[in-house]
Amino acid sequence: MAASPEVGAWHTVARRKKGPRSNNSPHAAARQAKAGLDQPDARSTSAKHPIIKNGRLQEPLSTPSQHQSHLAEIDRTYGRVRTAYTSSPSYAALEALVRTHAASHAPITRAICLGNGPLHAPDSSWDRRRAANIQTATFLALVELLTCDLFVGSSSSSHEKKPRIRCIFQEPLYTAADRAYLTTTLGCEVVDDPDALEHVTEDSLVWGVHMYHSVYGDILCRVAEPAMLVGTPWDVWDALPPDEDGRVAESLKGLAKMDASAEYDLFAFPQDEGHFTFCDTGIYWRRNRTMAAQDKPLAAENHVGENDGEAGPPEKEAQG
């Protein structure tokens, strides 16, 4: 698919033509790690040696005062990050993308967010906490733009509304404070790993930034054609050296099929300035099937009309 001209800071991504594989990219090591080529498969690497039981982080119980303190800290951090993001060129580019293409692409009624990392983790570095907060803020900003609901995910407005698009979060490393903040303050749902997959439908936005190959495989095995998938595009995976046992290639069959489908457009995700938060991230957005179905009869009618108006073979001149 040919790339379209840029509008602002975003553009449609051209599918990469087949050619020699290269491993010289500055992000090659990170891509190999993400593909599971140099470490065990996992759904999150946000903390050191966490104890996960039944898809949920096991952590020491907090006192009520500690819990409230954690919530206040999350609110301060998330509020600062969200305010900075919604004032940034990255947000403006995302807004332009959605406003331009929403009418011609699939509508979304629910949004599933996978593996953003914990908003509040005592042993987590600031970079990781910032990444978790900016991804969460960006995910909810995208939901806002898709619903034109300017209050979704904003805890500072006295007129705050619950999102019309149902938002479901899954992150095994969420703390109790993270869960409380997402559900009580932001009006979202949090489920245990891997229950979020049960909520994926063809009208879903699935958010999986920097996930392992098996996660994309699980998503697209359940629902082959979600309305939108935000994650690592096929060409990034395809540029990796082939794995010996074919495990990665098998997991990514669904993504390769989506990438090749004429039903999907692929857009580069607007970058988080000065950070690698959304490097190698794209938006697969399915075209609106209802509009496509309506366009077919119209195109056929126009084709018939054009044929009716075509000049036939020249008539022989009357001979006197």
PLM features: residue spans?
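Domain-level detector for long C-terminal conserved domains
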Residues: 2-9, 17-38, 43-44, 49-110, ...
